[in-house]
Amino acid sequence: MATPANQTGRITQVIGAVVDVQFEGHLPAILNAIETKNGDNRLVLEVAQHLGESTVRTIAMDTTEGLVRGQEVTDTGAPISVPVGAGTLGRIMNVIGEPVDEQGPIKSEGLRAIHQEAPAYTDQSTEAEILVTGIKVVDLLAPYAKGGKIGLFGGAGVGKTVLIQELINNVARAHGGYSVFAGVGERTREGNDLYHEFIESGVNKKGGGEGSKCALVYGQMNEPPGARARVGLTGLTVAEHFRDQGQDVLFFVDNIFRFTQAGSEVSALLGRIPSAVGYQPTLATDMGALQERITTTTKGSITSVQAIYVPADDLTDPAPATSFAHLDATTVLNRAISEKGIYPAVDPLDSTSRMLSASIVGEEHYNTARMVQQILQKYKSLQDIIAILGMDELSEEDKLTVARARKIERFLSQPFFVAEVFTGSPGKFVDLADTIKGFRAICEGKYDHLPEAAFYMVGTIEEAVEKGKKLAAEAA
């Protein structure tokens, strides 16, 4: 129920990002946006609690330095609303929909509230179709669903952002529809780089407008927790509008953990008693409210790729553990694999996908994937024996398994387009058929004669054969 707009109140206390406002008469509804001036800037506060004595407790969407008690605040009578539509493409906006790219105002098709109901069961679509990414380890072992939810899990510095940028490069460029990128509590430098890369690669035009394909919504690390807790919803609102117009939208979020982290900062300031590991007691509810809206309906689809930081590499931490339940495919990045120099450092045994079923991907793909996992699992179980007794104590059959597993491990690596700058090797996009063919041949022993090094950082199996010849020539 929207309250009458233009009601005024006065600030009674400011504690960091939380501001208490006293109203006379009607109280603004929970989640309403109320506005005040902070210097020359418009400061938006979102109502979080009704405290009694005509006072509401609000969360600020920007810094509160400079606010004073007794300052006047106006109720807008509605939740935070942001511009949506084609005018947002090629532009960067913040949590409240203001442009931050210095390219003038956003020409929008109207405003849409950032708090929406999730689509009803009857409106949701359940078709299963594979989204080919061109990344071998993903396409083979944990394939992504079109219109599905994908999570990239990893600790600090194992390559989540590089992987998300490669997916943007491979999928968004080839993709005819629109994309939305929500930068939630990540590095401003990365956001800036991404903006310029999009312009250089032709995904976006400077200043937006005709020909731009991706809308950017940023609430980075330097923003107060209120903005970081809501910027994911702002990005999602832009994506939902495109979906409801019948588009197939790609929605990238980097990083969902920061959304949870911001919620936990705000929760403590709101006086809630923390739950496990100090997270907010409403962790599952907050995550559900965001994730249930990211869905494919009969009108259009949203395929979302979400980077999820794993604190201290512990997948059982409540923040990553809560996100697991919502995803169709999980790509787990492993520090032990990145330490071997194998990139992308995707764990082939820990990553899962509901799409990896013979009825969806076909018998050949399914059997090849399972064969690869079987060999890698056998190698994993032999590692203790190798560490204690050495390779010589293994049976001939086990030695062969180990040799093939090490080749598979290296063949799961691949040079990325977005990493060309710092690796010096050109990126590779590998078709699904080539990926299946290559791994099947390794499992069947057709390339037992090639050295391990031939499989490292190549695209297709033909490139590995070429590299093997080159290595043999150099050794001769």
UniProtKB/Swiss-Prot annotation:
Broadest EC class assigned to this enzyme: translocase
Binding site for ATP: G154, G155, A156, G157, V158, G159, K160, T161
Subcellular location: Cell inner membrane
Transmembrane segments: none
EC nos: 7.1.2.2
Top-level taxon of origin: Bacteria
GO cellular component: plasma membrane; proton-transporting ATP synthase complex
Keyword tags: ATP synthesis, ATP-binding, Cell inner membrane, Cell membrane, CF(1), Hydrogen ion transport, Ion transport, Membrane, Nucleotide-binding, Translocase, Transport
Catalytic activity: ATP + H2O + 4 H(+)(in) = ADP + phosphate + 5 H(+)(out)
SMART domains (alphabetical): AAA
GO molecular function, one term: ATP hydrolysis activity
Membrane topology annotation: Peripheral membrane protein
Primary location group: membrane
NCBIfam families listed in its UniProt record: atpD
Record function comment: Produces ATP from ADP in the presence of a proton gradient across the membrane. The catalytic sites are hosted primarily by the beta subunits.
Similarity remark: Belongs to the ATPase alpha/beta chains family.
Subunit structure: F-type ATPases have 2 components, CF(1) - the catalytic core - and CF(0) - the membrane proton channel. CF(1) has five subunits: alpha(3), beta(3), gamma(1), delta(1), epsilon(1). CF(0) has four main subunits: a(1), b(1), b'(1) and c(9-12).
UniProt protein name: ATP synthase subunit beta
Provenance organism: Rhodopseudomonas palustris (strain ATCC BAA-98 / CGA009)
